[in-house]
Every structure is written in structure tokens, then in C-alpha cells.
Amino acid sequence: MNAATSPPIWSTDLPLPDRRQGKVRDIYTVPPREGHAPGVLIVATDRVSAFDVVMPSPVPGKGRELTAISTKWFDKIRSWDLIGDHLISTKPCDVAGLDKTHYPQLEGRMMLGRAARVIPIEFVVRGYITGSGWKE
């Protein structure tokens, strides 16, 4: 089943503690693996938010697209070698406490990260100038 044929994910219900639900993402505490600190699992659902309101109809595949955009930016920022980030993995098999039955739902829409103190800064990127527009 691919993103075009899979049903939209409105909400998740994983066997992990401390589930919190944002407007479009579900967040869980991930139990520590041996020698590691607890982590955080961020799952991008297909919920749609506009003007701080969650719309009643999800968009199939939206969570996967959000995750793809996020990981692209993490890769770009990492290539500059200026600052670290929280991202550990985007693979469901790396999440302690889950079994293989949860993998299809999470594939392409999750990020496993280090638990960290939140710095309340938000960046919104809606587009950027390239090509001849940048030269001017």
C-alpha cells in the first residue's frame, strides 16, 4: 500500500507513554534503550490546520510530505556543520517499544529524536528565491 492508496492517518494510538497531540503531529515519549536517554517520537498525521484550527477532513499523505520536507531541511542544515539537532532516525524499526505491526503506519511520517529542552522559536518557510530572482 502506498501513500496514494493508503487511508489518511487522523490520529495514532501507539503503545508508548505520554502521548501528546498537537494540531498535526502526535508526540510520544520513547523508552530508553540500553545506554541511551529516553527519546521522543514525532508522528506527522494527515490532519490539516489553518489559523490554529484543525480542519475536519484530513489529506492523505500529508504527514509523509511534512516529514520529507523536515528531513530535507535537517540534512541541509547538517551539511553546513554549524549546529546539532535532535534527529536520530526516521526508521520505525529504531523505535524501542514498537513491534512490526506499527511500522506500516509510521513509515515515512515519523522522526525519532533526542528529548531536549524546547526553545520557543518558530520558523515558517513558504518559499525561497532562486535563479534569476536571487541574482537581482
Q: What are these model-predicted stretches?
A:
Residues 2-136:
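Active-site loop/lid in soluble adenylation, ligation, and acyl-transfer enzymes
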